[in-house]
């Protein structure tokens, strides 16, 4: 009976992780991500409707309290199959923001390479390591640098045109956001493998909300940055009935 209960808990844990990863599908045009009641406490200090760029990312500076293990290898295999499809859609969604066209089939090849890395981690039955690796890949230079350059290039003109119509708090927030985007791009150019620094900058972006909607809409109508970063190792520490994302 104890073993059955443990297996059920693992099933629910994997289902919760995969459900949250589906929220990362940036090609969907469903108007944003549903928020759990607990999340409202973290965002109530922001203006109404503002959701952070990088919302939900774990704090890389804090120590992990432990690692979640998976007892059955078939659960990992099933999870990887689903993650392969969701990751492929996420990559395509991000690349839709960039004017730099990728060779046909490059997305699939990149995702398959990632999945091989994830599979190498399954020997330790450590789902947290898999999720951690996935986050590093999704925030890598290959994926985010071009979209961030495209967005950052539009800020100076936008800030100049809208300064008179924004209150001081809004203008300062968007200006801070622009500085963080420039800082992130510098890291991509000079320290592309510094995943800790990249993650920390993305966390700071949480405090600034999303980029101006007209900037993003100009690049790709319907695109929603709010779900970027919804996949987090911290969600594995939540109970099956309580999603922290």
Curated annotation (Swiss-Prot):
Tissue-specific expression: Expressed in roots, leaves, flowers, siliques and stems. Highest expression in roots and leaves.
Q: Has the keyword Cytoplasm been applied to this entry?
A: yes
Pfam families xrefs: Pex19
Q: Which residues fall in a compositionally biased region of kind Polar residues?
A: 96-105
Please provide, in alphabetical order, the Gene Ontology terms of the cellular component aspect for this entry.
Answer: cytosol; peroxisomal membrane
Q: Where is the composition biased (Basic and acidic residues)?
A: 33-44, 71-92
Question: Post-translational modification, briefly?
Answer: May be farnesylated.
Residue positions where Cysteine methyl ester is found in the record: 242
What InterPro entries does the record point to?
Pex19, Pex19_C_sf
Q: Give the bilayer topology.
A: Lipid-anchor
Q: Where is the lipid attached (S-farnesyl cysteine)?
A: 242
Which residue ranges make up the pro-region?
243-245
GO biological process per UniProt: peroxisome organization; protein targeting to peroxisome; protein transport
Question: Which top-rank group of organisms is this from?
Answer: Eukaryota
Residue ranges for the region (Disordered) are 17-106
Which keywords does this Swiss-Prot/TrEMBL entry list?
Cytoplasm, Lipoprotein, Membrane, Methylation, Peroxisome, Peroxisome biogenesis, Prenylation, Protein transport, Transport
- State the compartments where it is located: Cytoplasm; Peroxisome membrane
Complex and partners? Dimer. Interacts with PEX10 (via C-terminus).
Record's family?
A: Belongs to the peroxin-19 family.
Query: What is this protein for, i.e. what is its function?
Result: Contributes to morphology determination of peroxisomes, but not to import of peroxisomal matrix proteins. Required for proper post-translational import and stabilization of peroxisomal membrane proteins (PMPs). Acts as a cytosolic import receptor for PMPs and delivers them to the docking factor PEX3 at the peroxisomal membrane for subsequent insertion into the membrane. Acts as a chaperone in stabilizing or maintaining PMPs in the lipid bilayer.
PANTHER family linked: PEROXISOMAL BIOGENESIS FACTOR 19 (PTHR12774:SF2)
Q: What is this protein called?
A: Peroxisome biogenesis protein 19-2
Q: Which species is the source of this protein? A: Arabidopsis thaliana
């Amino acid at each position: 009976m104890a073993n059955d209960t443990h297996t059920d808990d693992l099933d629910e844990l994997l289902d919760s992780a995969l459900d949250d990863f589906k929220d990362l599908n940036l090609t969907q045009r469903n108007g944003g991500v549903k928020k759990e009641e607990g999340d409202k406490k973290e965002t109530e200090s922001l203006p109404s409707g503002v959701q952070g760029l990088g919302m939900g990312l774990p704090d890389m500076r804090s120590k992990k309290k432990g690692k979640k293990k998976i007892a059955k290898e078939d659960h990992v295999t099933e999870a990887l199959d689903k993650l392969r499809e969701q990751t492929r859609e996420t990559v395509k969604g991000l690349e839709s923001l960039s004017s730099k066209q990728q060779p046909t089939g490059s997305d699939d090849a990149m995702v398959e390479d990632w999945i091989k890395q994830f599979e190498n981690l399954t020997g330790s039955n450590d789902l947290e390591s898999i999720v951690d690796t996935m986050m590093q890949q999704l925030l890598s230079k290959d994926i985010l640098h071009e979209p961030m350059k495209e967005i950052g290039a539009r800020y100076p003109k936008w800030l100049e045109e809208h300064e008179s119509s924004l209150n001081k708090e809004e203008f300062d927030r968007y200006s801070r956001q622009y500085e963080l985007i420039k800082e992130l791009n510098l890291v991509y150019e000079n320290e592309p493998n510094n995943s800790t620094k990249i993650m920390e900058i993305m966390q700071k972006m949480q405090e600034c909300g999303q980029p101006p909607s007209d900037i993003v809409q100009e690049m790709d109508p319907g695109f929603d940055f709010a779900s970027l970063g919804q996949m987090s190792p911290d969600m594995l520490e939540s109970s099956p009935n309580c999603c922290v994302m």
